[in-house]
Amino acid sequence: MAGGFVSQTPGVRNYNYKLTPKVFVTCFIGAFGGLIFGYDLGISGGVTSMEPFLEEFFPYVYKKMKSAHENEYCRFDSQLLTLFTSSLYVAALVSSLFASTITRVFGRKWSMFLGGFTFFIGSAFNGFAQNIAMLLIGRILLGFGVGFANQSVPVYLSEMAPPNLRGAFNNGFQVAIIFGIVVATIINYFTAQMKGNIGWRISLGLACVPAVMIMIGALILPDTPNSLIERGYTEEAKEMLQSIRGTNEVDEEFQDLIDASEESKQVKHPWKNIMLPRYRPQLIMTCFIPFFQQLTGINVITFYAPVLFQTLGFGSKASLLSAMVTGIIELLCTFVSVFTVDRFGRRILFLQGGIQMLVSQIAIGAMIGVKFGVAGTGNIGKSDANLIVALICIYVAGFAWSWGPLGWLVPSEISPLEIRSAAQAINVSVNMFFTFLVAQLFLTMLCHMKFGLFFFFAFFVVIMTIFIYLMLPETKNVPIEEMNRVWKAHWFWGKFIPDEAVNMGAAEMQQKSV
């Protein structure tokens, strides 16, 4: 039987709830949206290391890879090859802006469905690709799907979960992403051993499976109480809230949702309003957290792990196996965040993960520098290569329980309803833009910066860790509608939040500012 709880957080309202099967099931299915993103992250790097794929579409890179005299740092340097990976994220950036309107007007679940549908079409284009144009069209369609899913799923999970467990439930999105990566690397490992072009076609075409999963999931999922109220279905919203909280005593939380909705209706232009001073904390965080998440360098590992491991001297099969190991490590360590984020809070995980990533990145850069040198003509022995893989796993673990899940959780939970869709669109857009830059420029940066590239990312890890320490207040256990109290108490952000904002709605605040 589900136990009864009362959210207990000093200075904010307390809500009644029980851990019901319905909230577990809905959040579990909702998290499927992360699978399409994760599968693509894991599949693209493996496919770009497969010789039949390179020979078919990127013969110049294939010849460089086979050259015995090629600088190890520059073996895979090709703007066209990186465009295959990065084009998805430009499309995701654009679609996330449209997705914010669909998420608000039609509900979170239909935005998720549309994401799965466009991802499905994109997987068909890639699986049957006959030329570069078909590959890129497919990647763009995949990107539209990722943009819709990434915009709607974190918001859906945050709104369905009880405040005290919002972190754990929201981190299901990151778990799904990493699970998708692991499944993709396993598939790549086996398809890479197939003769001819069938292997990479299977890898790319199987992206249709997670797409179908999120489409079916979206059709059977209920919409969130917040979204139902926002669209005028008040009675249905209360019934849904009672259902997912497992109690009829939801009047206080329901009234807060009603108040938040009424306030949001007075805000005609959320994109304009998010620029107002009282929303400065949310604007800065939704810009800087996804920016810093990408500057951890994690997608260097996620996109190009097989390519990177081949650069380190591993064979094709061993490179894919090593990428699979790092993916499994990341999946297991993501569960650490699921079970600790609502107990220890967001800040401690951000800070600890940052320190762990910093130390491992410096060690990786130093070892590669010593072994390859600046010319990139040295050799790395098996024991040293295995040590580098171990250091990469330590780095991935630090990311997996900090910046990985929290980079999606925190931006989705800090914004009031009246700017939530715009804030999440900004979050996804910034994330996708810098994901695109990292994906497009990494192989060129590796060629020119060599082992110094790891020190480059380590520098940003220092900056982001300091930023979190100084600028992010603790948000665990705080209801979304009560978040202004947290910002008001902060040493810096408090000056942007008027005293009345803690107890007064957005509509009244807007009238006072006119």
UniProtKB/Swiss-Prot annotation:
Matches recorded under InterPro entries: MFS_dom (IPR020846), MFS_STP/MST-like_plant (IPR044778), MFS_sugar_transport-like (IPR005828), MFS_trans_sf (IPR036259), STP/PLT_plant (IPR045262), Sugar/inositol_transpt (IPR003663), Sugar_transporter_CS (IPR005829)
Tissue spec. comment: Mostly in flowers and roots, especially in anthers, including pollen, and root tips. Also present in some hydathodes.
Gene3D superfamilies: MFS general substrate transporter like domains
Ranges that cross the membrane: 23-43, 80-100, 117-137, 140-160, 172-192, 202-222, 283-303, 321-341, 348-368, 387-407, 426-446, 451-471
Entry GO MF terms: monosaccharide transmembrane transporter activity; sucrose:proton symporter activity
Classification via NCBIfam families: SP
Descriptive protein name: Sugar transport protein 4
Organism: Arabidopsis thaliana
